[in-house]
């Protein structure tokens, strides 16, 4: 007899909640939006924490390249090569590699360009951007200066120091 009582209690509580929602839709909407915002905020916090706790990837050394002139017909035993090149590092030993800055969020001094042309192109682009920023900073043309624009026959086609063609 306890099971039907629980079923009736669940039904009664559900009907009471439905009646409350019907009577106060603003309250329901507020709680719903509050729950969604809280869930998004919690998700954002967990995402930030997981990113900040993630280990930073270590840069790999230069890839080993095979000599293209070597013949591939000769049988090579890769297992023996791997066993011969394995070395154990002590506590004071370090791996050779590019020196990185001590700041974890600072800029890395690693050349990302593979050719001189790409480097030159990037430098020219940087110079253009610097010139545009300098032009923008030194001042904009005076748009409220003399000159008229419009359908009148005396219109000069200029507005301030700018000329529109």
UniProtKB/Swiss-Prot annotation:
Localization: Membrane
Modified positions (Phosphothreonine) in chain numbering: 85, 148, 158
Topology class, membrane: Single-pass membrane protein
Alphabetic keyword roster: Membrane, Phosphoprotein, Transmembrane, Transmembrane helix
Ranges where the record places region Disordered: 57-109, 143-165
A GO CC term attached to the entry: membrane
Acidic residues bias (residue ranges): 74-84
TM segment ranges: 29-49
Domain of life: Eukaryota
First and last residue of the signal peptide: none
Family listed: Belongs to the EVA1 family.
This protein's name: Protein eva-1 homolog B
Organism this protein belongs to: Homo sapiens
Lineage, broadest ranks: Eukaryota, Metazoa, Chordata, Craniata, Vertebrata
Gene (name only): EVA1B
